[in-house]
UniProtKB/Swiss-Prot annotation:
It comes from Geobacter metallireducens (strain ATCC 53774 / DSM 7210 / GS-15). Disulfide bonds: none annotated. Its EC number is 6.1.1.22. This is Asparagine--tRNA ligase. Keywords: Aminoacyl-tRNA synthetase, ATP-binding, Cytoplasm, Ligase, Nucleotide-binding, Protein biosynthesis. It comes from the Bacteria. Homodimer. It is found in: Cytoplasm.
Length: 461
């Protein structure tokens, strides 16, 4: 019995002229009196392997009755294909049905809307589009780890359950074992001291604060894990559960942070072009016509840097009308970000040094006492895709900022401790993994780049 090989390898010519065994799912089947053609896919690549079955096959009648979606094992000889569009095909000597699929199988040979496919998220990975999405997602995730490993960064697993709200927005999912029907009370309020963690706990919104602690011991670290936001936003860009990449560097300022972000983003763009060519060609042809050219441009670009103040002036001089106002002290909206990167710069740009009152308490206050050492990377078609900053390493200044924005220092005593002994300038950034995959594939809805999306009123599967 031949050992199984993956269809990706068979299509590369492995086993050519010899007997091989492949296993996979039938994408399509065409039958006639003299021959049956099965398009077989096992998820290892975008392309299908054509299986040719002839009447001399003992199970030919059974093969002709196979339905789309059935799982089969095929043993046969891999040969050069006379047909155009494929190099090799498999002439079957034996076809065994492993799992039947009848006409009720939802993924029949027709075009399905993304909205419909979300309703069958347990089956959509078998479709062309989502097979490509999740191969790219897997490959890029591996590239993230490789990038940081090659540069000596320590991979840190930060906690998923936490009692701190890094962003201070209060959009945390709560974790409790208290009986919601009869919680213990103290002076009319829920007594969380009697909860499992003896405090009000939730799912993390970021691993940054804990990452900073490790950077003060290992210099360069990164986190890559799930994060959660209880934000009731039903938009194509928001999900309640998503993955974040968050590097942190000790002895680094804002410019070092921007340099790492540029190197990292260009690396990932180059990786997906080099490693996922077949899937990227599909996205370019069927999802986003200019995708490959746009990603190629970013991979080969030097990123511009623009002060927030200059960005505001450029926007004020714009000849287009914006939906949202443009004034110093207001945050940039997506329409502003896209105008800057697409019309003003014509490529990726870092906007730096934002007003401190629109940014988080942990960002380093600049000498003007009006701005903080923050940066956002803006890219064409998307706008902001990376956000980062130099962190405030001066204890008195950090305590003052926490007081300004109303962050309780008691819950972050450990974070303040990191500034008491051996504090260093340090910086880092965050990149939402799903938004990265959206950018690299041209997919326009975050629900379509994560296996089982979690959004308001939807946590099925």
């Amino acid at each position: 019995m031949s050992a199984r090989i993956r269809i990706r390898n068979a299509l590369a010519g492995e086993g050519l002229g010899n007997e091989i065994m492949v296993k996979g799912w039938v994408r399509t089947i065409r039958t006639g009196k003299e021959v049956a053609f099965l398009a077989l896919n096992d998820g290892s690549c975008f392309a299908n392997l054509q299986v040719v079955a002839e009447p001399g096959l003992a199970t030919f009648a059974d093969v002709c009755a196979i339905g789309t979606g059935a799982a089969v094992a095929v043993r046969g000889r891999l040969v050069d294909s006379p047909a155009s569009g494929q190099c090799y095909e498999l002439h079957a000597d034996e076809v065994a049905v492993i799992g039947l699929a009848d006409e009720s199988y939802p993924l029949q040979k027709k075009r399905h809307s993304f909205e419909y496919l979300r309703s069958i998220a347990h089956l959509r990975p078998r479709s062309n589009t989502f097979g490509a999405v999740f191969r790219v997602r897997s490959s890029v995730a591996q590239a993230v780890h490789r990038f940081f490993a090659e540069r000596g960064f320590l991979y840190v697993h930060t906690p998923i359950i936490t009692t701190s709200d890094c962003e201070g927005a209060g959009e945390m999912f709560r974790v409790t074992t208290l009986d919601p029907a009869a919680p213990p009370l103290l002076e009319g309020e829920v007594d969380f001291s009697r909860d499992f963690f003896a405090a009000q706990a939730g799912l993390t919104v970021s691993g940054q604060l804990e990452g900073e602690l490790f950077a003060q011991a290992f210099s360069d670290i990164y986190t890559f894990g799930p994060t959660f936001r209880a934000e009731n936003s039903n938009t194509p860009r928001h999900a309640a559960e998503f993955w974040m990449i968050e590097p942190e560097m000790a002895f680094a300022d804002l410019m070092a942070d921007a340099a790492l972000a540029e190197e990292f983003f260009r690396y990932l763009c180059r990786h997906v072009l080099d490693a996922c060519g077949e899937d990227m060609a599909f996205f370019n042809d069927h999802i986003d016509k200019g995708l490959i050219a746009r990603v190629e441009q970013v991979a080969n670009s030097s990123f511009a840097i623009m002060e927030y103040g200059e960005a505001i002036e450029r926007l004020k001089k714009a000849t287009v009308t914006f939906e949202y106002p443009v004034e110093w002290g207001l945050d940039l909206q997506t329409e502003h970000e896209r105008y800057l990167t697409e019309q003003v710069v014509g490529g990726p740009v870092f906007v730096i040094n934002y007003p401190k009152h629109i940014k988080a308490f942990y960002m380093r206050v600049n000498d003007d006492n009006k701005t903080v050492a923050a940066m956002d990377l803006l890219v064409p078609k998307v706008g902001e895709i990376i956000g980062g900053s130099q962190r405030e390493e001066r204890l008195p200044v950090l305590e003052g900022r926490m007081a300004e924005v109303g962050v309780n220092p008691e819950g972050l005593w450990w974070y303040l401790d990191s500034r008491r002994w051996g504090s260093t300038p340090h910086a880092g950034f965050g990149l939402g993994f799903e938004r990265l995959i959206m950018y690299l594939t041209g997919m326009e809805n975050i629900r379509d780049v994560i296996p089982f999306p979690r959004t308001p009123r939807h946590a099925e599967f």
